[in-house]
């Protein structure tokens, strides 16, 4: 099987889907080639709700699922944070809810999309990433700082920008 991954905001209504995904992963990806990534974006529940206005699993629910999903020697589940100015990033909250044995943390800059501009969101990767990463590693977490190809920003091909432009032109 080829390496595969799934990125999700962990919709609460999709718990059955997650169970099916776990079965598929265990049956078809026995070579540790599957990773799941949960979009977290903030450690403050109200801010998280604002960023992702859907019913979603709590940190504890994500943690319980991740512990079942990741077996010894497999890729850790990733907790993804898009670094946005003004949001809370508290390593102690992550450490209270998640195990560094089963989870790693990935931080990405907010891409300068039309949607981000309309919402007044600004990236603060430089201000947030290093201090947050330092505190997380102090709690035993592996941390990934992930900066995409900046050419994607220039040509507008990240985060669904191309689809949005196409939709507006139709």
Predicted features by range, described:
Residues 1-72, 76-85, 104-108:
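Core AdoMet radical
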Residues 64-170:
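Auxiliary Fe-S-binding modules of radical SAM enzymes
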């Amino acid at each position: 099987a080829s390496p595969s991954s799934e990125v999700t905001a962990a919709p609460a209504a999709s718990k059955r889907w997650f169970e099916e995904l776990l079965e598929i992963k265990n049956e078809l990806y026995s070579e540790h080639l599957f990773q799941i990534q949960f979009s977290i974006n903030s450690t403050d529940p109200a801010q998280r709700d604002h960023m992702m206005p859907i019913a979603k699993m709590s940190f504890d629910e994500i943690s319980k699922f991740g512990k079942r999903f990741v077996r010894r020697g497999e890729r850790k589940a990733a907790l993804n944070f898009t670094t946005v100015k003004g949001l809370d990033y508290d390593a102690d909250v992550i450490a209270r809810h998640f195990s560094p044995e089963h989870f790693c943390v990935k931080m990405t800059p907010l891409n300068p999309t039309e949607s981000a501009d309309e919402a007044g969101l600004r990236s603060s990767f430089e201000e947030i990433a290093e201090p947050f990463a330092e505190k997380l590693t102090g709690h035993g977490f592996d941390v990934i700082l992930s900066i995409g190809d900046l050419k994607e920003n220039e040509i507008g091909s990240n985060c669904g920008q191309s689809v949005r432009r196409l939709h507006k032109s139709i």
